[in-house]
Structures are given as structure tokens and as C-alpha cells.
Regions:
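Phosphate-binding site of ATP-dependent enzymes
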Residues: 1-78, 102-107
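ATP-dependent carboxylate activation and anion-phosphoryl transfer catalytic cores
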Residues: 69-175
Length: 175
């Protein structure tokens, strides 16, 4: 019906799963930030409409939550690390998965390099949990990118999160 009405849509199988994201920053080595998932308040199936995903609707807002399940977090991060050699180097990106808690199934969705850096989305939210302000995140990305491409010679200061990703399970950011 939506296609017939002229709308651009992507149709996906409904899994009752969570969208899970591993944000990665560039550096001397890839910097994996906290594994994050989106959840909708009051929706056990975690279904998000297009309007909700884009912040275009009134009502409950989705939350960005650091994953609590250490076994699943480790598994998803291992999948991410396995893909890095194919794409490295890059400035920043996110690796997206679907995680079904009832079965433990993890499905790869996509890699999005140079993705949205809006202050209320995954890369910025995970950076915030690691102790970076949005300004510091943008500064890190710009300096690393220009240095990597030979535009400037940046003084490299190792990125040292104030909180390690495995320590933030369950912390939440309203988006």
C-alpha cells in the first residue's frame, strides 16, 4: 500500500528485536564505544515507526540504552571487530545489528560510515557515556580525519574514555 501511494519504504521482517549499535571512532586503532540499543517506553515489542525514529511524532520518545547483557555485548562487539579490517581506516561509523532477547539471535543489519552525528543519536550518546561532550566528539573526528588524510599533522592525544564501555550497562540517554 505504501509503495502504491508513492512512499519510499524499506520493508523488513518484524522480529520483536532490538536495534543494537556499536559506534566506532577513528584513532591509531579503532575505538569501540559502548554497545547501545534503542527502546521505546511502554512497547515490549520495541516497534518504532518512521516518525518515531526521526523524532517527528509527539508522545513517548525512544531511549538510547547501553546494553546490559555482557555475553551478548561481547558477541556483538566480536562481530564488529571481525568486520573492521575490511573497512579500516575510517573516521567514525556505526555497526548495526538486530538482537532478539528471547532467542539470543543476532542479525547483522548494516554498517554506516560517516553517519548522523546529531547529539541525540548513537555515536554522540555513546561518546557522552564515555565522558566526551558533543564538541569534543566532533573535534576528535575532525582532527583524526584531517591527520589521517595528511591535511594537518595533529598532535595525537590518545582517546581515554572516562568510563569503559563494559562499565555502563543499563545507563540511558533520552533521545
Amino acid at each position: 500500500k505504501l509503495h502504491a501511494e508513492g512512499h519510499d519504504v524499506i520493508v523488513e521482517r518484524y522480529e520483536g528485536a532490538y536495534d543494537v549499535v556499536v559506534p566506532v571512532l577513528g584513532g591509531d586503532d579503532p575505538i569501540l564505544l559502548s554497545t547501545m540499543r534503542f527502546e521505546m517506553p511502554g512497547d515490549e515489542g520495541n516497534f518504532r515507526s518512521y516518525e518515531e525514529k526521526r523524532g517527528l511524532s509527539e508522545g513517548p520518545k525512544e531511549r538510547l540504552v547501553a546494553m546490559r547483557n555482557p555475553v551478548m555485548t561481547r558477541k556483538i562487539r566480536e562481530f564488529t571487530r571481525a568486520m573492521l579490517p575490511e573497512l579500516w581506516p575510517f573516521d567514525y561509523g556505526r555497526f548495526e545489528f538486530r538482537y532478539t532477547p528471547t532467542t539470543g539471535e543476532v542479525l547483522f543489519m548494516e554498517v554506516n560510515l560517516s553517519c548522523n552525528l546529531w547529539s541525540k543519536k548513537t555515536v554522540s550518546g555513546a561518546a557522552q557515556l564515555a565522558g566526551l561532550t558533543h564538541q569534543q566528539l566532533l573535534e576528535h573526528i575532525a582532527a583524526y580525519s584531517m591527520d589521517r588524510q595528511g591535511v594537518i599533522k595533529a598532535e595525537r592525544t590518545p582517546f581515554a574514555p572516562t568510563v569503559m564501555p563494559e562499565e555502563v550497562g543499563g545507563e540511558m540517554i533520552e533521545v
